[in-house]
Amino acid sequence: MDTQKIEAAVKMIIEAVGENVNREGLQETPARVARMYQEIFSGLGQTAEEHLSKSFEIIDDNMVVEKDIFFHTMCEHHFLPFYGRAHIAYIPDGRVAGLSKLARTVEVYSKKPQIQERLNIEVADALMDYLGAKGAFVVIEAEHMCMSMRGVRKPGTATLTTVARGLFETDKDLRDQAYRLMGL
């Protein structure tokens, strides 16, 4: 990541909105923003393979559900945050991931400029591709600051998105069971 370019761009934005980049409260802002972007965009170019490839053998194929995984990310359209909770269900095929690995999967894909629909897809596809799940179902609930702070200005509005892969695509009863276990 080119932090010098980020700092220069932030200085230009500060000046473009009519502020003084040398004002005491703004002098270190370009460097702070560059460091922040390094952190919140640390998922760029990464996948969840390293997390989901560390799995454990299991003899049954009962559904695994992990819900209320908090995340935050940046909307790629306005570069404003959106945040919320991800709920994951999957059907193992002989292997299960450690529970923290599901949260890490959400984290990897949320640490970049993102849209909610793609975040759903990337998490579900990672479970299928890297864990070898028989099915994956991901529900994400999020509030978007681009809708709360600007535009229609409707704070508190939740957007829900879902994606189903494998067994969840064809089995409505399985999806319904996942919804119930997720409390949705």
Swiss-Prot record:
Its EC number is 3.5.4.16. InterPro entries: GTP-CH-I_C/QueF (IPR043133), GTP-CH-I_N (IPR043134), GTP_CycHdrlase_I (IPR001474), GTP_CycHdrlase_I_CS (IPR018234), GTP_CycHdrlase_I_dom (IPR020602). SUPFAM superfamilies: Tetrahydrobiopterin biosynthesis enzymes-like. Pathway: Cofactor biosynthesis; 7,8-dihydroneopterin triphosphate biosynthesis; 7,8-dihydroneopterin triphosphate from GTP: step 1/1. It is an enzyme of class 3 (hydrolase). Zn(2+) binds at C75, H78, C146. Pfam families: GTP_cyclohydroI. It comes from the Bacteria. GO terms for molecular function: GTP binding; GTP cyclohydrolase I activity; zinc ion binding. GO terms for cellular component: cytoplasm. GO terms for biological process: one-carbon metabolic process; tetrahydrobiopterin biosynthetic process; tetrahydrofolate biosynthetic process. Keywords: GTP-binding, Hydrolase, Metal-binding, Nucleotide-binding, One-carbon metabolism, Zinc. It catalyses: GTP + H2O = 7,8-dihydroneopterin 3'-triphosphate + formate + H(+). Belongs to the GTP cyclohydrolase I family. Homomer. This is GTP cyclohydrolase 1. The lineage of its organism: Bacteria, Bacillati, Bacillota, Bacilli, Lactobacillales.
